[in-house]
């Protein structure tokens, strides 16, 4: 008998992943916070709020009961925003059976503690559960995966058996999964690419051109690499799907929420106004603060992240931030 799978979070990505698994004939239950959304998905087989236009698999079950979604499950996919992950895990802890595989598909750094999601998991859950933690990350817009456009991602875990299990479950003709053991690197790549996407969006909103965006992506990758190495990551990870791959997609794609927020900032809108218009979470807004604080604490030079933080939280004019980046003291490219 196959694994029973719960997916926690019915936003665009959670719904897409649940549907991918259910289309393979797997036993999948999708949890949504909103009872009315659960009722709608049961009645129409469509998540019109977060994934309109995609028909959901006939075998996919829906619930707003965490117990129903999590109790007795062999695999639990976590797709809640990173800033509420601790709260969600705390509620899930008494429901989880020993040996369950946890798959984190959220990207961020906890603001209060500056922990990555695997660190939050280790702090909240007993070792028997936290040890089978896997991160699923890479360049993957939900809408394109839902439309079965070819996509490649990474499943990273210190437990190679867990990574292989996640690879097997999620692999589909249009969804290729590679394994990796560098959890820290994959988590940092997924979190920081959203911050650099804000910078790329600001640049686009200011009309600064392709040269500027390319410079931000490349130097943003250097910042990702520096912080990752300081935290014990393998630098090679950042040349892969969870690093450069996700960074390029999020900094250039029109479906990128973080790039969209940045563009509107560059065009002169206020952050509160932008966020008030959004239905889904742009993780980079909170991650900009947590990443900048983490870099400061660890003594890591991250000037782009610093300027994004200042534009978001200190009302620094976007053009001034760009000028300050361009007039920093000259230095060697590496180092």
Curated annotation (Swiss-Prot):
What stretch or stretches form a coiled coil here? none
Its family remark reads: Belongs to the NAD-dependent glycerol-3-phosphate dehydrogenase family.
Residues noted as binding sn-glycerol 3-phosphate in the record, renumbered to the chain: 107, 138, 140, 193, 246, 256-258
Q: Keyword annotations for this protein?
A: Cytoplasm, Lipid biosynthesis, Lipid metabolism, NAD, NADP, Nucleotide-binding, Oxidoreductase, Phospholipid biosynthesis, Phospholipid metabolism
The broad enzyme category this protein falls into is oxidoreductase
The job of this chain, per UniProt, is described as:
Catalyzes the reduction of the glycolytic intermediate dihydroxyacetone phosphate (DHAP) to sn-glycerol 3-phosphate (G3P), the key precursor for phospholipid synthesis.
Q: Which domain of life is it from?
A: Bacteria
Q: Where in the cell is it found?
A: Cytoplasm
- Can you supply one Gene Ontology CC term for this chain's record? cytosol
Pathway membership: Membrane lipid metabolism; glycerophospholipid metabolism
Active-site residues from the entry: 193
Its catalytic activity?
sn-glycerol 3-phosphate + NAD(+) = dihydroxyacetone phosphate + NADH + H(+); sn-glycerol 3-phosphate + NADP(+) = dihydroxyacetone phosphate + NADPH + H(+)
Which positions bind NADPH? 12-13, 107, 142, 257, 281, 283
Q: What is this protein called?
A: Glycerol-3-phosphate dehydrogenase [NAD(P)+]
InterPro entries in the cross-refs: 6-PGluconate_DH-like_C_sf, 6PGD_dom2, G3P_DH_NAD-dep, G3P_DH_NAD-dep_C, G3P_DH_NAD-dep_N, NAD(P)-bd_dom_sf
What is one process in the GO biological process aspect for this record? Answer: phospholipid biosynthetic process
- Provide the E.C. number(s) assigned to this enzyme: 1.1.1.94
Q: Where the protein is mainly located, per its record? A: cytoplasm
Example GO molecular function: NAD binding
In terms of Gene3D superfamilies, this protein maps to: N-(1-d-carboxylethyl)-l-norvaline Dehydrogenase, domain 2, NAD(P)-binding Rossmann-like Domain
């Amino acid at each position: 008998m196959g694994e029973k799978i719960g997916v926690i979070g019915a936003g665009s990505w959670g719904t897409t992943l649940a549907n991918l698994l259910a289309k393979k004939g797997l036993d999948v239950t999708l949890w949504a916070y909103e009872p009315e959304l659960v009722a709608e998905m049961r009645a129409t087989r469509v998540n019109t709020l977060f994934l309109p236009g995609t028909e959901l698999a006939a075998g996919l079950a829906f619930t707003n009961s965490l117990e129903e979604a999590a109790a007795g499950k062999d695999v639990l996919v976590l797709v809640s925003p990173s800033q509420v992950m601790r709260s969600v895990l705390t509620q899930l802890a008494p429901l989880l059976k020993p040996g369950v595989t946890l798959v984190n598909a959220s990207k961020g750094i906890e603001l209060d503690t500056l922990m990555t999601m695997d660190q939050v998991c280790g702090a909240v859950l007993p070792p028997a559960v936290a040890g089978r933690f896997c991160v699923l990350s890479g360049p993957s817009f939900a809408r394109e995966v839902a439309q079965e456009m070819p996509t490649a991602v990474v499943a990273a875990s210190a437990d190679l058996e867990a990574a292989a299990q996640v690879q097997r479950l999620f692999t589909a003709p249009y969804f290729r999964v590679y394994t990796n053991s560098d959890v820290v690197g994959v988590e940092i790549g997924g979190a920081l690419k959203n911050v650099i996407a804000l910078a790329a969006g600001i640049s686009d909103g200011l009309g600064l051109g392709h040269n500027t965006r390319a410079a931000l992506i490349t130097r943003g990758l250097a910042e990702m690499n520096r912080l990752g190495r300081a935290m014990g990551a393998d630098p090679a990870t950042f040349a892969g799907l969870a690093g450069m791959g996700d960074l390029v997609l999020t900094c250039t794609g029109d479906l990128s929420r973080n790039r969209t927020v940045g563009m509107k900032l560059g065009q002169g809108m206020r952050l509160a106004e932008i966020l008030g218009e959004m239905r889904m979470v742009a993780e980079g807004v909170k991650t900009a603060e947590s990443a900048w604080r983490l870099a400061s604490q660890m003594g890591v030079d991250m000037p782009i992240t610093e300027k994004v933080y200042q534009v978001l939280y200190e009302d620094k004019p976007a053009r001034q931030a760009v000028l300050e980046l361009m007039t920093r003291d000259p230095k060697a490219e590496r180092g």
